[in-house]
A protein has these predicted regions:
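Aromatic-residue detector
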Residues: 3, 18-21, 30-33, 54-57, ...
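N-terminal functional modules and adjacent low-complexity/disordered segments of proteins
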Residues: 3, 23-25, 71, 81, ...
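Amphipathic alpha-helical segments
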Residues: 17-32, 89-97
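A cross-kingdom feature marking solvent-exposed beta-strand/loop segments within repeated
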Residues: 8-9, 28, 32-42, 63-77, ...
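Vicinal oxygen chelate
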Residues: 1-4, 7-16, 44-51, 56-57, 68-136
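Residues in flexible loops and secondary-structure boundaries
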Residues: 16, 21, 38-40, 66, ...
Length: 136
């Protein structure tokens, strides 16, 4: 699976707290589409509406390594691409000697499974892959 085959699903931005995330949303005129909590990543995730493009996901950690992202200040965190079969993609990467952060895909903040390619494979760029769930 190449990037040319996977459309951009969303852009993830870490914010230190919900108040700051909502302030950025207000400044940019973004409206909340939905929110969810991802226990594996200790984070509340707020997705925005996307008129023509991809939504922004505001990631608000309450524990774990994301709290230290960019020295606690937050910022642009990841690009997420949509794939039809996350497990097949993970197996493909494994055959290439690459690995995902989680041993198995996890439930995302929305109706999708997700996993991240280790940043070492992309020279520090954090890439997430998401697989929409049926009826999602």
């Amino acid at each position: 699976m190449m990037f040319t085959d996977a459309p951009l699903h969303h852009v993830g931005v870490v914010q230190p707290d919900e108040e700051q995330a909502l302030a950025v949303m207000e400044t940019l005129g973004l409206r909340e589409a939905y929110r969810g909590y991802v226990p594996q990543f200790h984070a509340l995730c707020i997705f925005t509406h996307a008129a023509q493009g991809s939504p922004v996901e505001f990631v608000i950690p309450d524990d774990g390594p994301l709290m230290k992202f960019n020295k606690g200040a937050g910022g642009l965190h990841h690009l997420a691409f949509e794939v039809p079969d996350l497990r097949a993609l993970s197996a493909d990467f494994e055959r290439q000697g690459l690995r995902m952060l989680e041993p198995e895909p996890v439930n995302g903040a929305g109706p999708f499974l997700c996993n991240f390619l280790t940043p070492a494979a992309t020279r520090g760029i954090i890439i997430e892959y998401v697989q929409p769930l049926p009826n999602g």
